[in-house]
């Protein structure tokens, strides 16, 4: 049950961040030389494949990919 809940969370995370875009549409603060909005997008470009990889690994362990 916990694995299924974690899979659902990993599936929903990239979509939830899209709903948060209006809240992060700011120039300040500057993070790593980028406006916060660009940093947010870059962060999720990196996090989204990690979520997909996590889902893949959990399903692979359960034999759900056969």
Swiss-Prot record:
InterPro entries: DUF3311. This is Uncharacterized membrane protein YoyD. Its main location: membrane. Pfam families: DUF3311. Keywords: Cell membrane, Membrane, Transmembrane, Transmembrane helix. GO terms for cellular component: plasma membrane. PANTHER family: BSL5891 PROTEIN. It is a multi-pass membrane protein. It is found in: Cell membrane. The chain crosses the membrane at residues 5-25, 30-50.
């Amino acid at each position: 049950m916990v694995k299924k809940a974690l899979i659902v969370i990993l599936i929903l995370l990239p979509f939830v961040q899209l709903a948060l875009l209006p809240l992060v549409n700011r120039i300040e603060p500057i993070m790593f030389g980028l406006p916060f909005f660009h940093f947010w997008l870059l962060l999720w470009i990196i996090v989204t494949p990690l979520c997909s990889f996590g889902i893949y690994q959990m399903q692979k362990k359960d034999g759900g990919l056969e």
